[in-house]
Amino acid sequence: MKTDTPSLETPQAARLRRRQLIRQLLERDKTPLAILFMAAVVGTLVGLAAVAFDKGVAWLQNQRMGALVHTADNYPLLLTVAFLCSAVLAMFGYFLVRKYAPEAGGSGIPEIEGALEDQRPVRWWRVLPVKFFGGLGTLGGGMVLGREGPTVQIGGNIGRMVLDVFRLKGDEARHTLLATGAAAGLAAAFNAPLAGILFIIEEMRPQFRYTLISIKAVFIGVIMSTIMYRIFNHEVALIDVGKLSDAPLNTLWLYLILGIIFGIFGPIFNKWVLGMQDLLHRVHGGNITKWVLMGGAIGGLCGLLGFVAPATSGGGFNLIPIATAGNFSMGMLVFIFVARVITTLLCFSSGAPGGIFAPMLALGTVLGTAFGMVAVELFPQYHLEAGTFAIAGMGALLAASIRAPLTGIILVLEMTDNYQLILPMIITGLGATLLAQFTGGKPLYSAILARTLAKQEAEQLARSKAASASENT
C-alpha cells in the first residue's frame, strides 16, 4: 500500500508565500492611509484656528464695548467713539484684504468651491493671515457678518497647507484635504459636526468627489475639529433657546406656508446681494483708498447701531434667543428685520472678510417669529408657540438662498438642541427650497463663484492682450 509522505517543498512554499505577502504589504500604496492621518491633522489645526478666531472676535468686541464705558457720561463723545472704534477695526480688515489677498474678501466659501473645481488658486501663505486678522477686524468691529465664512476658508487653506508641508502628491489627496478643512471649519464655527459633513456633501455636491477615502477623511477632520472646539467651549448648544414644545400634526400646514414665504424671499435676497455688490463696486471703482474708506463708513455705521439698536448689529447669535423667547413686539420685529436686511447687504456685499450664514440665520429667526406671532393670533385653538416658528424659519432662509435644506435643518438642530422640531423644520425647509428652485436663479454661492470666474477670465484676457501688444512693439 502506498503511503503519503510529507512534501519537502511545503515549508519552502509557506516561507515563499509569507515573503510575498510582506513584499505586497510594503509595496502597497500608502496614500489612502496617509490621507486619513493628514485629515486628522487638518481637523485638529482647523479646530484650534476656529477657537482662536472665536476668542479673538469676542475679546475685540469686549474691548470695544469697554472703551465706550469710559465715555458714557458724554453722549456725543460716546457716539463718536462708537463710530470710530468700529470704523478703524473695519478699515484694518478691508485694507489687509485689498492689499495682500483679494481672494480673502467676502465669505470665502465660493473660493473653496472654485478651488475644488481647479478654477481658483489656493495661496494659503497669504490667505491664512489675511483672513484671520482681517476677519477679526470686521467681526470684532460689530459688522453684520458670520464667522463661518472665515473658518471655512481658513480650514480649506489649512488643508492645502498640510498637503504642501507633508508633500503629499496626487489630485485625490489635494481635493480631499481641501474639502476636509472646509467641513472642519464649518463644524467648528457652529459646534455642529453633522452639519459640517452635510455642508460638503450637499452644498458643494458639484465639486466634491465622492470616494470612500474622501468621505472617511471628511468624517475624521470634522470629528477632530469638533473635539478641539468642545475642549475649549464645553459640550453645550451654541444658541440657548430652551426646550420648545413640539408642533401638533394639525398645525404642520402652517410651516409649509412659512416655507413658501421664505421660498419667495430667498431668491429676492440673492438678487439684492448681487445688486448691492454692483452698486458698491461702482462707488469705490476698484480704488483701494475709496474701498477702505467705504468699509470704514459701513463698519462705523454698524458700531453706532450696536450702541443705539444692538439687535440690528453683529452676527445675530445674541439676537436669536431673545427673538425666539418673544421679547419683541411685532413692530420691533419688522424694524429689526428691515434694518438687518440692509446692514447684511451692506456688510457682505462690500467684500468684507466674513460670512453670511449667521446673518441669514438671524433674519430667518426674526421673520419666523413674526409669522408665529400672527399665527398665534389667528389660530388660538391650536395653542401655538411663536418660538417653534422661529426655529423652523432659522434654517429656511439658508435653505432657500444657498439651496442646502439638509445643511440648514441639521445646523439649526445641532445649534439649538431642539430635535423634536425636526418634522416642521423639514417641511419649512423643503417648501422654501422647492419654491426657490421653481422661481429660478442660481444658489448664492454659485452665483458669486460665477462672477469671480468671469472677472478672472476677463483679467487674464486683458493681460494676454497687453502682453501681445508689448511683443508687437
Swiss-Prot record:
> Where does the protein end up?
Cell inner membrane
Question: Can you name a GO cellular component term?
Answer: plasma membrane
Q: Where is this motif: Selectivity filter part_2?
A: 146-150
Kindly provide the intramembrane ranges recorded for this chain.
109-116, 177-189, 193-201, 387-401, 402-404, 405-416, 417-421
The short motif Selectivity filter part_3 is annotated over 355-359
Q: Which GO terms describe its molecular function?
A: antiporter activity; voltage-gated chloride channel activity
Q: Where is this site: Mediates proton transfer from the outer aqueous phase to the interior of the protein?
A: E148
**Catalytic reaction list:** 2 chloride(in) + H(+)(out) = 2 chloride(out) + H(+)(in)
Q: Which residues bind chloride?
A: S107, I356, F357, Y445
**Alphabetical list of SUPFAM superfamilies matching this protein:** Clc chloride channel
Q: Where is this motif: Selectivity filter part_1?
A: 106-110
InterPro entries the record matches: Cl-channel_ClcA, Cl-channel_core, ClC
The alphabetical list of record keywords is: Antiport, Cell inner membrane, Cell membrane, Chloride, Ion transport, Membrane, Transmembrane, Transmembrane helix, Transport
Please give the residue ranges for the topological domain Cytoplasmic: 1-32, 117-123, 167-176, 202-214, 282-287, 439-473
Marked site positions, Mediates proton transfer from the protein to the inner aqueous phase? E203
Q: How does it sit in the membrane?
A: Multi-pass membrane protein
Write out the topological domains of type Periplasmic.
70-76, 233-252, 310-329, 377-386
Transmembrane segment boundaries: 33-69, 77-100, 124-141, 148-166, 215-232, 253-281, 288-309, 330-349, 355-376, 422-438
Q: Does the keyword NAD apply?
A: no
- Similarity comment: family membership: Belongs to the chloride channel (TC 2.A.49) family. ClcA subfamily.
How it assembles, according to the record, is: Homodimer.
**Known role:** Proton-coupled chloride transporter. Functions as antiport system and exchanges two chloride ions for 1 proton. Probably acts as an electrical shunt for an outwardly-directed proton pump that is linked to amino acid decarboxylation, as part of the extreme acid resistance (XAR) response.
Q: What is this protein called?
A: H(+)/Cl(-) exchange transporter ClcA
What is the name of the gene encoding this protein? clcA
